[in-house]
Amino acid sequence: MTEFSPREIVSELDRYIVGHAEAKKAVAVALRNRWRRRRVPADLRDEVTPKNILLIGPTGVGKTEIARRLAKLAQAPFLKVEATKFTEVGYVGRDVDQIVRDLVESALAMVREKRRAAVKAKAEGGAEERILDALTGPGSTAARESFRKKLRAGELDDKEVELQLADTGGPSFDIPGQPGAAVFNLSDMMKSLGGGRTKTHKTTVSGAWAPLIAEESDKLLDQEALTQEALELAENHGIVFLDEIDKVASSSQRSGADVSREGVQRDLLPLIEGTTVSTKYGPVKTDHILFIASGAFHVAKPSDLLPELQGRLPIRVELKGLSRDDMRRILTEPEANLIRQHQALMATEEVTLVFTDEAIDALADAAVAVNGSVENIGARRLQTVMEKVVEEISFTAADRGGETVTIDAAYVQERVGALAANADLSRFIL
């Protein structure tokens, strides 16, 4: 779990996302409160529940990007799901309990990776012995030592070996009517009966290291303790980002078949409030899982959500639409901005791509103009405009090695000016 202060979290998010100070503060405080709760006296710890957040803002302003960056920062089990993927219990589709099961899988992967790193040195020794067994056979000590030296020197990396590895890719199937038994894997069942199957793999020595180290690490790990730690991590530090929550809100203007829209909201209520969900690793309490919901609310309004669900998302943050200045900053400020990405792509062909300040202004103007005349899709419009501008250069770059190509305002106008000005053309091309 990360120990960044709220200010550090915000400055970390600032490296990738332009503006939205209020939203960044809200998620930073929510993340820090997880750390604070662990230090509260034990009698109060269970009473301190996370304050769930609802992010409201037009499409393309950075709601999902905030979640993506937060996931990397949090160092906690994190799951991003679209609310539209779920259906009410009784309909064909995934039920909302699957969110918790996926979160547990994410926690399990995190804990396993951490534990594997701790036993990696020992596991490498076991993997080396198995590769030597495959190369020389179990006996022959003298030949084995000579091969060991060559193996460590990397001289045998391209040699092909045949290995017996655990078979993890057995067929999976659903068991209807079984709560928490969403998907069973035949290999898992065989393993639990004490008969784990193996499969012969042909690979090079260099390709054999990763699967062998993973397998040897798992032999050294206490699987039961690992599962318990993962369940505890998911319960106390899990974060779920529910995207497109507005798509399951029933708009007052929309009539007709409302298949399981409200039902999904009703199913989400106990999950967000706190319930116990059965998973194949054991029961998981959701009382302390942090939920961050987000939606554009173009058609529906936040008030169209069930009142009980609104009450369970107490912190509301509105993200403003992007201005022309924001668009310009998005092109230049984030660490992996679009201009830098395209320059790096062209550099692989030994073409130096230069954007003048006027060209950057023209790109921002074109994106704002098209957003205003057609559909406002926020910063995503910049990608469309940028692709149109560099299309010809990308196509001919392979034949222009060593050249420096300067993109100025006139070039941008030539490529997208007419399209941006003509609403009908923009509708289909930009």
Curated annotation (Swiss-Prot):
Single Gene Ontology BP annotation: protein unfolding
Domain of life: Bacteria
InterPro entries: AAA+_ATPase, ATP-dep_Clp_protease_ClpX, ATPase_AAA_core, Clp_ATPase_C, HslU, P-loop_NTPase
Disulfide bonds: none
UniProt entry tagged with the keyword Nucleus: no
GO molecular-function term, one example from the UniProt record: proteasome-activating activity
Gene3D superfamilies: 1.10.8.60, P-loop containing nucleotide triphosphate hydrolases
Family annotation (HAMAP family): HslU
Protein name: ATP-dependent protease ATPase subunit HslU
Organism (species): Caulobacter vibrioides (strain NA1000 / CB15N) (Caulobacter crescentus)
